[in-house]
Amino acid sequence: MSNQSFRLVLGIAAIGFASISAHDAFGAPPTVPFGVEFKGCVESIGVALAPTENVVALTPPGFIPVGIGTPTSPIVVRTADCAGISVDGGKSKPGSVVQIGAVIVPPAFSGEDIDNYTFWYYTSDERLAHRLRKAGVSAQHVETIDYVLEPGMSGVPNHLAVVVPRPGDPRFAVAGTVASSVAPSGAFRAAWWQKTAAGNVRMDTTVPVIAIGAADLTLATRPDNALGALIGATTLGFPILQQFNVFVGAHMDVFVAP
């Protein structure tokens, strides 16, 4: 799929806890803004539909789910695993990020390809979780996110399984087949938002060059947790959009929107 087609699909859909002292091992840097570098990453993207009333219940005023006025609204499930994550120029370490949120019409638009409101954010990178929480984002540090990608050739389906265990809440898994691509599709920019006591925090990620592949994935969760309540089921497919992407590097800016 070309980058132009990808943007079109997203347009049609109008589509990561113990607290850590500011003087612990991470020091006491400014809360926001700050930057994050991601290196050598694979990423799955799934866009599904959930009952609009359930999506609205998790979305604060000022953020408009794109399905408002219709029975269902698109939600995004993103998983990423990187060879290196570096927060504010710190040491780069391997890590994973998992995000779930609603595709929204944002309070302010600045040229991004997609805007999402963050329901849940999980990361295995302790420093990233710490900095996001300092910024007011409800990021969860889940040290043992299981991200298993079977080795495979480009364009040939292979198995992907991502499991968010305790202390992640809600817990869930995403699994299925994916096929990577080596064909670059240009740049992509996504903004994930969350309302905090300090204001609306944006997590803007720019990927200069991304290779967009295919995926056939299913999410599984428990009926008695918040995710099961959101989707109204224990399993969820992704009929709107599924992708498995590869990129060499990306940069995320975290800041309070003016």
Residue locations for each model-derived region?
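Bacterial N-terminal signal peptides that target proteins for export
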Residues: 1-10
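Intrinsically disordered, low-complexity segments
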Residues: 3, 17-19, 122
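Bacterial N-terminal signal peptides
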Residues: 9-21
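Signals and flexible motifs at protein termini associated with secretion
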Residues: 19-27, 102
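N-terminal domain-onset segments
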Residues: 26-86, 217-236, 240-243, 251-258
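Aromatic- and glycine-enriched beta-alpha-beta binding-site module
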Residues: 82-167
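Interaction-surface and assembly-scaffold signal
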Residues: 135-258
